[in-house]
Amino acid sequence: MAPLRGWCAKGRRLPARVPHGHWKTLTFLAGLRADGVVAPCVFDGPINGTCFRAYVEQILVPALRPGDVVILDNLGSHKGAAVRHAIRAAGAHMLFLPPYSPDLNPIEQVFAKLKHLLRKAAKRTLEDTWRTIGDLIHAFPPKECQRYLVNAGYASA
């Protein structure tokens, strides 16, 4: 990801490298607990119902504990019967957000920080970006994750 802004002296050009060619889409999925980010996964390209189902069954469900709440937006792939069954079979509950309410989804704050850190790292290849994401998962300490949950209204301090 390329940085969006830069700084230089007034009246001078900012020298910077910018990517040329087609944009590449990466999809990052993860869960958020009060003690950190769990079940991270990066897909090369956009996801569909099949990809999301595989993520839930193979990565998210093993990380779930009975009584966990899985917060989902209204993306069509989130509403599949197999996804609902897998999450409920793990003893977790599902909470669907109202339309257009990213402020109620605490993982959005994680994604915002992750995007900022990725732009700052300015990696140009998919492999470097994947490695950087893997390293950045540890940039979310428990106190910060707790604040994200409190800010979205799901827990008290």
Label every PLM stretch briefly:
Residues 1-157:
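Short functional hotspots at interaction and active-site rims
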